[in-house]
Every structure is written in structure tokens, then in C-alpha cells.
Amino acid sequence: MDYEKIGFKAGLEIHQQLDTHKLFCKCQSAIKEDGNYSFGRFLRPTQSELGDVDKAALAEAKKNRYFLYTASDESTCLVEADEEPPHAANSEAIDICLTTAVLMNATLVDEIHFMRKIVIDGSNTGGFQRTALIAVGGKIDDVGIQIIALEEDAARKIEEKGRIVNYGLDRLGIPLIEIATGPDIKNPNHVKEIAERIGLLLRATGKTKRGLGTIRQDLNVSISKGERVEIKGIQSLSSLSKVAEKEVLRQIGLINIKEILKERIEKKDLEDIKLVDISSYLKDSKSNIVQKLLKEGCAKAFRLPGFKGLLKLNDTKLGKEFAVQANIITGIGGIIHSDELPGYGIEQKEVDELRAILQLKDNDALVIALGKENTVVNALKIVIEIAKKVIDGVPNEVRRALPDDTTEFMRPMPGAARMYPETDVQPIRVTKDHIDRIKNNLPEEPIEKHKRFMREYLINDEQTKQILSSGYEIDFEKLVKQFPEQKNVIIRTFLNTFSELEKEKIDTNVVDEKMLINIFSALTADKYSKEAIPEILKYLILNPKSSIEDAIKTCGLYATDSNKI
């Protein structure tokens, strides 16, 4: 595809956890699966400084959800519960952000002011997230950096059952650096390249966390006839380019649908749509789904002018979009459209009867909702509103990345009414002395480090990239200095053993400096042979409380005494 021709533009937002204590208290920033207390609350939208209410917050409030919070004394205090004012901002986290900004040649702010960003999806107990602008401007290669910010991470979602959502507070308050690029990214492959460059620069500070969930990437994508769409929660580098490609196809598909609808209908045709109760017509249906949902209430439907054949197209899947958005806001589970009928046990004769009742024309579709009457009515009204947006083309919205690299609706695009000043945290002056101290202690630039690794460790360009992108370069250098006679074994472990274990779905992110030192200390002491490293490493990852001696003994990997051979 010619991405320049279609006017492709993309910008990245990288959110990276910093390896320090929490942002507004001294609690450790470690994930604790088990909590020892819990509490719950409802959250409601508040007005901004100018008296406006953010539309994204309003959409969230309509879901009327109850939030249950699970916490541990080891990783949370009253600050996370929003029962105590925030303490002074974490100075180490601020310095990491300032260091990153200097490395990117960004312009630092004179004074750091924290703001409150309204978030009432339950991921923040106070109904807002604290965030502060650190720097503006800067560049990564040919891509501009718009902002560098410091913010607190959100709570970790544990489960969602109906209208009750359970969050863990262990993650809430972990410092995050946010780096947002300009819309200068030229194609999907370029997206991945820039994300890699930013990742290397962040790891150069030596103060970022590693592992699943410690870095999250949001992507803003638009094409010339489309709209800016923000895609949140892309977990891996490999998914970035695929998500961008599929979003382009989705937007092209929506633009094509817009053109088809222009030929079939006028906007006014969607203005006076009537809901029709079809419960009596489906009461004898052989469909198990229909019978189950009818017991909860009723079935209603409406004629959707001009949409026949447009609801199940591969790249857009409008029918699924109707169902997802209606479910997010109302909780409804039963939305059916005519492009997937006959189906779900609904037979062709029933479809024909419904088409006649609703007086469908050749190009018309029908949409059915089943369940409690109030829920059904609200859900169908939402579907009608979505259809009205589709006739205008690509909606400007926030979407969620899915495991197959497609996306689904998440919420409307937030506006300026989302932000207001944080009055509980004092402004922080960024003095010349402070900046000089940062500049005098800058880490090694990634490009220089790359050259040095190739020169010092006699490894090639691709091997160097692999080690530097793993996040283990600091451990690697420490091990080579401590065990110089094992240099080749250490290199082989980082280049081959780690990737082999990852292919077995073994999480190598739990490997730390202490574990590696114990492994190579025992090897140097001839307690086992170097061929056993993969098995020992695997055992210690799966049994993190075990010692190196336990691993050697359990795996039966004692080195053979050459004198006994």
C-alpha cells in the first residue's frame, strides 16, 4: 500500500514504568497478587476548571459501575485509597524524566505543575490521574517529540463481573514517563522503528522497569479522508505495525461505506427511526438464544435504511461495532443484525416475516435487541447514533487494541474539560543548578553504547541490538566484568538461551541480577557444566524461591569429577 498517497499519519504515546518507589508516597512499586484488605466505591464525573464536563467521563458514568479495590499493606497506603493527601513528588522519578528530556534535546519547563486528569473508569480511586508536563519539543531521528510528562500509573484490573469491577491497587501510583511524538510517522514499519528507538533511549537511563505490562504503547492514526483515532494498550513492539496496518484498512473501509451510503440514503433518513416490538413474532422461535433472552424481557427491532450488506464486511465489522458499543454502555448481550441472518437458530422464514413487518426495502438492514425492555431500548438508541456517525465517515474516538491486532471501541475522544489543576501537590522549580547536575550525569547515548558493545565484546551488529533491546545490558556488562573467563558463555546465554526459553512460553522477565550472579558463580566453581545453564535457568524462573543448589540437585546436574572418569 502507498501510505504517502493515502495521507497516512501516526503518532506514538509511550508509557514506561520507572524503577523507583511510588510517585506520591514511599510504598514499593512491586506487583502483589494477594491483598489483605478491600473497599469499594462509585465514581462520578466532576466539572473542569471552567465548569465543563468531559464527554468521555459522561460516557463512562452512564455505565453505572461499582468498583471494588483490593490492596496490600506491602504496596499501598492511604494515598492510594485517596484517604490521605499525596506526599511530595518522587524526586528520583522527576530526575529520570529530566534526563530523558535532555537526551531528546527537548525544552524543559521552568516549573513542574501537576494536573488532575478526570478518569472515572475505576482505575484511579479518586476519579482522576495526576500528570505533570516535564518538557516539550525534542526529536528522535526525523520524528518530533511533542511532550514528555510524568504521571502515576493506574490500578490493575483483576476481573469484571457485570456491573462490578475489581481492581488491584499495587500498580496504582507507580511513576510513569509518558513520551508523545508528533504525527510525523510515515508508515506502519516506521511506527515500530521509532518505538524501538524510544525504548532504547529510556533503557539507557538504567531506571526503567522491565517485563510484561511495564511499558504500554498508544497509537494515533489517521489518513487523509479519515479521522484521528487513538488506539490504547498495544503491549508489544511486534504488534505496533500490524495494528497500524489494520486501522488503515478499517478507516478505508468506513470511507467506502460512507460513499455507498451517500448513493443509497440521505442523512435525514436516519432521523425518525421507530422501534418495533417483535416479541410476539419470535415467541415460537427455535433459537435457544432468542428464547433465553425473551424470558428476561422483550425483543425490539428497527429498520436501518441503506445498510444492507455493510454490517459484516471484514475490515469494518459494523455489526460487531454496534454490539460492542451497546454492551459497553448498557451491558446488553443480545444484538443481532440482518447481515448475519439466518443464524443463531433464527430461520429464513422468520427473517422474511420480520422484513415484511418492518417494511424493509432492498438496501435496508434490520437490527434486533433482546433482553430487559429498558436495556433494549437504550441499546438500540445507541446503535442508531452509531449509524448516524457512520454516514459521516470515520468517527474520532478512542479504541482498544485486541490480541489479534484489530481494535474495538473504548470511549469518545476526551476534550480539554478533562484536565484541572492539582491543588494538593506544590509546584517544583527546575533550577539551572538542577539542570546542570542532570547534564553532568547523563547516561551513555544508545548509539555510542551500541558501538562500544561491538568493539569491546566482539559481537556483531544484530547480536548487539538483541542484547540492548532485551533490557539486560546492565546485567550483561556486570557479569562479563565479574566472570571474564565466562564471557562467551554469558554472551550465548543472553543471545540464545533467553530466546529459546521464551519460545517455550517461559517468562524470562523474572530473571534478575542476583539470579544470574548465582548461576555463573556456581559455574565458575565447577558445580555444574555450562551445557546445563538452560535447564537451571528454567528451573529458577519457575521456582523463584529456590536456590542454585536446589536447581542443581533437583535437575541432577552436578558436574562430573574428571579424576573419577
Where are these regions (language model features)?
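Core structural elements
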Residues: 214-226, 292-302, 348-361, 418, ...
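Basic, nucleic-acid-interacting segments
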Residues: 1-435
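Extended, non-catalytic structural segments that build the interaction scaffolds
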Residues: 434-438, 478-485, 516-528
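C-terminal accessory/binding modules appended to enzymatic or scaffolding proteins
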Residues: 449-452, 459-461, 558-565
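Charged, conformationally dynamic linker/hinge segments
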Residues: 437-444, 451
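M16/insulysin-pitrilysin zinc metalloprotease superfamily fold
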Residues: 391, 419, 490, 498-510, ...
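Feature representing long, continuous alpha-helical segments
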Residues: 324, 474, 488, 492, ...
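Strongly charged, low-complexity linkers/loops
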Residues: 508-517, 530-565
